[in-house]
Swiss-Prot record:
Known role: Murein-degrading enzyme that degrades murein glycan strands and insoluble, high-molecular weight murein sacculi, with the concomitant formation of a 1,6-anhydromuramoyl product. Lytic transglycosylases (LTs) play an integral role in the metabolism of the peptidoglycan (PG) sacculus. Their lytic action creates space within the PG sacculus to allow for its expansion as well as for the insertion of various structures such as secretion systems and flagella.
UniProt topology in membrane: Peripheral membrane protein
Catalyzed reaction equations: Exolytic cleavage of the (1->4)-beta-glycosidic linkage between N-acetylmuramic acid (MurNAc) and N-acetylglucosamine (GlcNAc) residues in peptidoglycan, from either the reducing or the non-reducing ends of the peptidoglycan chains, with concomitant formation of a 1,6-anhydrobond in the MurNAc residue
Protein name, as recorded: Membrane-bound lytic murein transglycosylase F
Keyword flag Signal: yes
Chain's gene name: mltF
Pfam families, per the entry: SBP_bac_3, SLT
GO biological process: one example: peptidoglycan catabolic process
């Protein structure tokens, strides 16, 4: 009986082995199902990324970045906790994914055929290209043959396979790698003239130009490619299906558009002279008024209050407009009286009153507007008046949009200057196009201050590390 049972068990095992040999896709499917079930069982989604101002970073207000916000939303969509693991470069990131140490690689990664053969691809959520960068004011290269020196890229960069492929047709192409600097730091080194060229992703370059305007684009190294998440390789993927469903859902409910608005839209306009002037003001003027912005920030970041003041007056407490508004926050006489200040050219009085008035407007907004969007509605009202904000929200609803969604409302602001629209509104004509640009400028100024401070902090920490190393 025992012998019969043993032969039966062995026979069943052989049949299962044969089934796996004949139908290997079943084995792959089970393996993937096991991986996905492990994710669900551990109740944690492990996402790998790279520290970067657009993808993921931890600032004064906690974790932020495109990849973080998408990953957090995806984890919430699955009912899971999110664990973020950071890596120094894309090579380390893909190694971790291949070793199943993470479930998703998300770091502003452009689609690459070589990686697509090794891993599953999630849905694309924006597109970008690799570009060659040089210092503004030096000779611009228009093609690879015009490069006069080596390109410098970080060790493990995703652009290295692309450079290797291009070298086959351009044997004079040269580059070297460094493990001492991140891609963002290399962009700043180009701007400072410390290295001649680097290669970076187009959106990263646009972001860096608002911190260091001497960064200039020579030419596109590649065409635009989709930015994607990479997942473990399998011929059957429940995880991939969930990602695709989530991205489709996120697009339909406006999450993707909202993230693009937050991280990309302010990068579209780049004025070298304006950015250079602003960065100089951050270094020379802002320190004088920072204590006041911190003192009267209320529920805002002090950097936001500073950005508003720069948009209003370029941090000039004696600024005056032809319409009679005055001071660092450019207050009208009526607003000054309402906020009970006596001297609009007194920087402290003006900053306090401007902040209190903006908070007053924000606090009047309905709770149906998302908390993170209230600042933009409040700023629009600060610029053109509360009544006109009510009008544009009503107009947005009439046109089939959501009056509580800043993206919907924002695009209708210019319509307040069109007779066919304002003639039917309670408060009539308004220069809504100015309010639109006003909010966009403040968003850009705010991000520039935050990024500039982050870089200065990194430099300071690096100097301390170097001093500590020298002492030992």
């Amino acid at each position: 009986m025992k012998g019969l049972l043993a032969r039966l068990i062995i026979g069943i095992a052989l049949l299962l082995w044969a089934w796996d040999m004949i139908f290997p896709w079943q084995r792959l499917m089970r393996a993937e199902q096991n991986h996905y079930s492990q994710v669900l069982q551990r109740q944690t989604l492990k996402v790998g990324t790279i520290n970067h101002p657009l993808s993921y970073f931890v600032g004064a207000n906690g974790k932020s970045g495109i990849e973080y916000e998408l990953a957090k939303s995806f984890a919430d969509y699955l009912g899971l906790n999110l664990m973020i693991k950071t890596f120094d470069n894309s090579e380390q990131l893909f190694t971790a994914l291949a070793d199943n140490k993470i479930d998703i690689a998300a770091a502003g990664l452009l689609y690459q055929p070589e990686q697509a053969q090794q891993f599953q691809i999630g849905a694309s959520y924006y597109s970008a290209s690799w570009q060659v960068v040089y210092k503004k004011g030096t000779t611009r290269p228009y093609k690879l043959a015009e490069l006069q020196s080596d390109i410098v890229v970080p060790c493990g960069s995703a652009v290295i396979p692309i450079l290797q492929h291009l070298k086959a047709k351009n044997p004079m192409l040269r580059w070297h790698t460094t493990d001492q600097f991140t891609q963002e730091e290399l962009l700043l080194q180009v701007a400072e003239g410390k290295i001649p060229y680097t290669v970076a992703v187009s959106v990263d370059i646009s972001s860096a130009q608002h911190i260091s305007p001497n960064i200039a684009v020579g030419f596109d190294l590649t065409d635009e490619m989709p930015v994607v998440w990479y997942l473990p390789k399998s011929s059957y993927s429940e995880l991939q299906a969930s990602v695709l469903d989530f991205m489709h859902n996120a697009n339909d409910r406006g999450l993707i558009s909202k993230i693009e608005e937050k991280y990309f839209n302010h990068l579209i306009r780049f004025d070298y002279v304006a950015v250079q002037s602003y960065l100089n003001a951050i270094k020379t003027i802002l320190p004088k008024y920072r204590p006041l912005f911190e003192k009267y920030k209320g529920e805002l970041d002090w950097q936001m209050l500073a950005a508003i003041a720069y948009q209003e007056s370029h941090w000039d407490p004696n600024a005056t407009s032809p319409t009679g508004v005055r001071g660092i926050m450019m207050l009208t006489r009526a607003t000054a009286e309402r906020m009970k200040i006596t001297d609009r050219t007194n920087a402290e009085q003006s900053i306090r009153a401007g902040s209190e008035y903006l908070h007053l407007l924000i606090n009047q907004l309905p709770d149906t507007i998302a908390k993170e969007d209230k600042i933009w509605f409040g700023l629009a009202a600060y610029n053109m008046g509360w009544g006109h904000l009510l009008d544009v929200r009503r107009l947005t609803k009439q046109l089939g949009g959501d009056p509580d969604n800043w993206l919907d409302v924002k695009k209708n602001l210019p319509l307040l200057a069109e007779k066919r629209h304002y003639s039917g509104l309670k408060y009539g004509y308004a220069r809504g196009f100015e309010a639109f640009q006003y909010v966009e400028n403040i968003r850009r100024y705010y991000n520039s201050i935050v990024n500039q401070q982050r870089i200065e902090k990194q430099k300071s920490e690096q100097r301390l590390d170097n001093q500590s190393t020298e002492m030992h």
